[in-house]
Amino acid sequence: MLIDLTHLNDATFFDCIEASSKPVIVSHDGVQAVCPSECNLSDDRLRAIGKNGGVVGMEIVKTELVRGSQETGELVTFDNVIDHIDHIVEVAGIDHVGLGLDYDNFPLVRNVHRAMCPFPGSIEGFYTGIPKGDHMTEDPNDISEGYVIAEYLVNRGYSDNDILKILGGNLMRVLEETIG
């Protein structure tokens, strides 16, 4: 079983870490040290994930990346995402960070949801009704260019091996250790 600790309070989060004999994940989150938000992870939580062998999936929801971006309309960039990744690496280690974009507006996902629920507008209102600009990047309406995260990681000095870990290698390790 793979345990996801996203959206848990401190007591439950640390109880789950203590009870788990396998690595856990936080499927999508940012870090408080870069953007103070109750939803983001404290350094204590990051250290616990690192000690457990788990992985934090870095999200791209702008209100969790840059403080005040929702109110100011400021566009969040890939540099902001990498700031969070840098901090996770600094506190938990390179083996404990990945991508967990928390973004379901990809065309394939939209089409699957539409096929599952034939009622007009029902999917748009829930899955794709996020206001434009509520997610991140230079073009807030299109994250399909997400592969450029690798270019930003290169520019920050990450090695090819470390980039492969961030882009999926770390999560694959945890999946192999938990669900085989």
Task: Please name every model-derived segment.
Residues 1-25, 38-54, 79-95:
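Histidine/acidic residue-rich metal-binding segments in metalloenzymes
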Residues 3, 28, 56, 102, ...:
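Conserved, mostly hydrophobic/aromatic
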Residues 30-42, 56, 70-75:
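Glycine-rich tight-turn/loop motif centered on a GG-T
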Residues 131-180:
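Mid-to-C-terminal alpha-helical segments outside catalytic/metal-binding sites
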Residues 17-23, 27, 76-90, 113-127, ...:
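Short, electropositive alpha-helical surface patch
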Residues 59-100, 104-107:
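Active-site capping/gating regions of soluble enzymes
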Residues 8-14, 31-34, 62-66, 105-107:
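Active-site environment of divalent metal-dependent phosphoester hydrolases
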Residues 60, 92-117, 121-139:
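Short acidic/histidine-rich active-site segments
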